[in-house]
Amino acid sequence: MHKYLEVNAGGGLVTNAKGEFLLIRRSGLWDLPKGHQEPGENIGITALREVEEETGLKELTLGEFICVTDHTYFRNERWHLKHTWWYRMTCQGNGCDTVPQTEEGITEVRWVEKAELAEFLQQTYPTIVEVFRSIGLSEKFLPSVKQNS
């Protein structure tokens, strides 16, 4: 059995005035911005800070808590268990201009219309689809689940 290093993170599901969703591209997959909580930091503040750092967005407004997702990964010769607290966020006007944080491996930041989401979410992690499902987004906007024959 692995002994996991537990990590807390905050992330954001950001929308703009047009109702578009913000996605980032990292390691060849579409993702939502998120990052590690600093010692003593409120997790909502973590989510805001990380979204701003990874996307260049300004004047974000923190909205309601969505859900917590968990995933594991192997880095620096040990297993990590990351708990991510997800929040809705909004931005307005020029505060919605984006700049990818390339030093974190983010190659693109893109605003995506709801009708296009399923296409983008075919290339993401299952936990990211769960965040969208948690806000009650209709299944027609999510990637179809392939059944094993």
Describe every region a protein language model picked out.
Residues 124-149:
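Charged phosphate-binding loop/patch that engages nucleotide di/tri-phosphates or the phosphate backbone
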Residues 1-11:
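Acidic, metal-coordinating catalytic segment for phosphate/diphosphate chemistry
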Residues 37-126:
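Unchanged
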Residues 26-27:
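C-terminal lobe/hinge of AMP-binding adenylation domains
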